């Protein structure tokens, strides 16, 4: 099959959150047996991207706020074709130093219009797979009866909380026809459109990234017109849980670790624990944490409202009260939250057991996965989550809120601990206390939790197989 993946993130070329990881992992796995091309907008931060082979270069026109010119360079990249599209006559839209900015709807709709024009001239694809609201306009553009692309369209919701509300006039500035434009419009306000709503109606199949998240989306009434769209498309909507690249995330070969190990040491638990403790000792020395404090609980996360920052703060208090170590590695574009955590960072700078690292450092994060005994993921919403899968592979027990993919992958008493009520700090604190007590007093139970996590199948092959089966069913 020829499969085209379209997204605005692709790790490691451009990454902000889990979207880039998910798109890259799926694309690379599918490319082992299929012809895969990834379309990505050009950002200044990837201007130095190079590849051993440029496959093609082309210029073309697209329609968005007038007739515009774009160019596309296709590279051979890790078994697939990576095509970077530059909006030459609207270059200012992607001139920012960050991936996301205030005019995201305009920027990404322009990219979608250019991608549609590119696909109309490219080798025909069997499947065009769109990732999240950013490229939602592309679903309607590809259905244009005057110049249709005869590919089956799959749309994946990675985060239902972000939907792409915009003016209908903006979308009409592309080549979308009136019929398909109507799918994007809100009935209650025809001057407003929603990129995700149109993508739901214009795609041949919709997926999201976990089974529980499907039900959470169906039960989300925050916008009744989006809810109606989900119900209308429910027969072609399912969840396929993400996986992780087990070659990239491998404690046996990870160069960021002070001491490497893997699941084969589960038969020698003393050796396994010693290796994790050696990583912890190196991390403690690096961050100036006293060796008197253990276990070590970590948070590795963006600091945004949906990730539960209030619970991150609560861990600090709990760690002080119960004399264990806590490390937070996180970034935030929310100035209010960032300032709150910077103030905490300053206040805790001399703490013997608490460290807040407010920038993302991949080698440090990897070492922390290995050194930590537990990782806490207190998200209000988490479509799938890769953090808990990575942590379990590194022998680190997840403490999570029972939501989305966290609920599907972390089973209390089997491979982790859970809480549910976001309005109940007592339940959250009880989970922390239970986990710390189990670590300190029940080593056999703790080993079983680690074993279940390390042996869990979290690779990409199962995810890719589900998608291949879906693609084939659409083509049959």
UniProtKB/Swiss-Prot annotation:
One of its GO terms (biological process) is glycogen biosynthetic process. It comes from the Bacteria. It is an enzyme of class 2 (transferase). InterPro entries: Glyco_trans_1 (IPR001296), GS/SS (IPR011835), Starch_synth_cat_dom (IPR013534). Keywords: Glycogen biosynthesis, Glycosyltransferase, Transferase. GO terms for molecular function: alpha-1,4-glucan glucosyltransferase (ADP-glucose donor) activity; alpha-1,4-glucan glucosyltransferase (UDP-glucose donor) activity. The keyword Glycosyltransferase applies. Pathway: Glycan biosynthesis; glycogen biosynthesis. Synthesizes alpha-1,4-glucan chains using ADP-glucose. This is Glycogen synthase. It comes from Chlamydia pneumoniae (Chlamydophila pneumoniae). The lineage of its organism: Bacteria, Pseudomonadati, Chlamydiota, Chlamydiia, Chlamydiales.
